[in-house]
């Protein structure tokens, strides 16, 4: 899958299903995940003058993104999130 423009495809890292004390959390009580791993990167955004700005993330980077960002898609039996580079808040090094 190759994203277009400044879009990034990520695989979401799921949150823990148990609390530290061992209580199992139902899906309705879980926080929406905000961490993922970059699996594909678009070519970057194009400025008004035609210059292309390359994305700051690379395939394999672990990232933190905005809570309600992106579009969920299913591809080859796996679930991914496609979001814009501006929705990425940080890269975890």
UniProtKB/Swiss-Prot annotation:
It comes from the Bacteria. It is found in: Cytoplasm. InterPro entries: Chaperonin_GroES (IPR020818), Chaperonin_GroES_sf (IPR037124), Chaprnonin_Cpn10_CS (IPR018369), GroES-like_sf (IPR011032). PROSITE patterns: CHAPERONINS_CPN10. One of its GO terms (cellular component) is cytoplasm. Belongs to the GroES chaperonin family. Heptamer of 7 subunits arranged in a ring. Interacts with the chaperonin GroEL. HAMAP family: CH10 (MF_00580). This is Co-chaperonin GroES. It comes from Geobacillus kaustophilus (strain HTA426). The gene is groES.
């Amino acid at each position: 899958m190759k994203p277009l423009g400044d879009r990034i495809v990520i695989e979401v890292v799921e949150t823990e299903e148990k609390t530290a004390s061992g209580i199992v959390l139902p899906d309705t009580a879980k926080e929406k995940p905000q961490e993922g791993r970059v699996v594909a990167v678009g070519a970057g955004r194009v400025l008004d003058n035609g210059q292309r700005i390359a994305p700051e993330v690379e395939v394999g980077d672990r990232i933190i993104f905005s809570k309600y960002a992106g579009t969920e898609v299913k591809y080859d039996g796996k679930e991914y999130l496609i979001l814009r580079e501006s929705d990425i808040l940080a890269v975890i090094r």
